[in-house]
Amino acid sequence: MMVPAELFARVEFPDQQVLADAREYQNTLVKPAGSLSRLEDVGCFIAACQGQVPPRRLDRPRIVVFAGDHGVAARGVSAYPASVSLQMAQSMLDGGAAINVLARAAGASVRVADISLDHEATGPERVRRSCGSIDIEDAMTGEEVLQALQIGIRIADQEIDSGADILIPGDLGIGNTTPAAALIGTFTLAEPVVVVGRGTGIDDEGWKRKVTAVRDAMFRVRTLRQDPITVARMISSPDLTAMAAFIAQAAVRRTPVILDGAVVTAAALLANKLAPGARRWFIAGHRSPEPAHPIALDALGLTPLVDLGMRLGEGSGAAAALPLVKTAVDLMIDMSTMNDAGVDRADGADNSADSGASAGTVASDPTV
């Protein structure tokens, strides 16, 4: 099996000197130092990603939804039939899904990548039709997992080369929270009963079936945690693997990524294994009620921007947070400095960088 180093170049840090300069610059603006709290943190993070203070406006946000079906859905782990995946993909293509509305409101555009939906189709983004039931068989073959990785890399390169300045991966696929929970449990050593939630709204019996499927999947890779490509091949799916490669390649290309809920964050965990340090380029858009989500966020060292109780997927929570990220950048660009506005500083004010954005939100590595 190919090692990740053969697929992904080294991930660099966002510019640490620019991060320090951005924090210092925040303290010159017409406000008490640190008073905008996490908005300051996010603005500084984007400045560090772009390598300049103030940062450039985020004019080309792009949402890419990775769609695929899952063999494990036949185990009764979802409240909806697998046919809904293809129907929802068509709704997105028609512009009528929640993610389309959220994207339009936030000034973003949406691309739907059909990686492994369960229908007869061909195309450069297709890996296979659905995937194996991960509790008893591999999700895909060795050739297919490499194909999924290469597709994710190619999609990231296409979007960045076309001018995208911030990326949001989204998910679509009935049953996809099952491989997501299995990945999160595997990489964080959390127990199946801890990472399994209600997904699309399953009842108690459905939850028990889902726990069993996740338990069995995790058992199959119990000695393979240090081999992320093999783990992906065995217990993820083509769409999750392509998404992970997309996220990892965005980090390689120095492009920030806003993460959505449990499925996307599971892919982000895998991305950070494939391209160590990729997490330095992540923003956690929101917190999902899925119990695996905060576990994955903690493992990545991320604090979500909003908590609206959203559990739709599609990239919807990240899209809801996108206006905050754009506003954080606009504040740095459009606010006056105290000198320009003729505003007196507070007596004895400490205007050093340390008195700026609240500690712990943008870490020194930096991670939001």
UniProtKB/Swiss-Prot annotation:
It comes from the Bacteria. The active site is at E314. The keyword Transferase applies. It catalyses: 5,6-dimethylbenzimidazole + nicotinate beta-D-ribonucleotide = alpha-ribazole 5'-phosphate + nicotinate + H(+). The keyword Ribonucleoprotein does not apply. One of its GO terms (molecular function) is nicotinate-nucleotide-dimethylbenzimidazole phosphoribosyltransferase activity. Residues 349-360 have a biased composition (Low complexity). GO terms for biological process: cobalamin biosynthetic process. Pathway: Nucleoside biosynthesis; alpha-ribazole biosynthesis; alpha-ribazole from 5,6-dimethylbenzimidazole: step 1/2. Pfam families: DBI_PRT (PF02277). Residues 344-368 are annotated as: Disordered. It is an enzyme of class 2 (transferase). InterPro entries: Nict_dMeBzImd_PRibTrfase, Nict_dMeBzImd_PRibTrfase_bact, Nict_dMeBzImd_PRibTrfase_N, Nict_dMeBzImd_PRibTrfase_sf. Catalyzes the synthesis of alpha-ribazole-5'-phosphate from nicotinate mononucleotide (NAMN) and 5,6-dimethylbenzimidazole (DMB). Belongs to the CobT family. This is Nicotinate-nucleotide--dimethylbenzimidazole phosphoribosyltransferase.
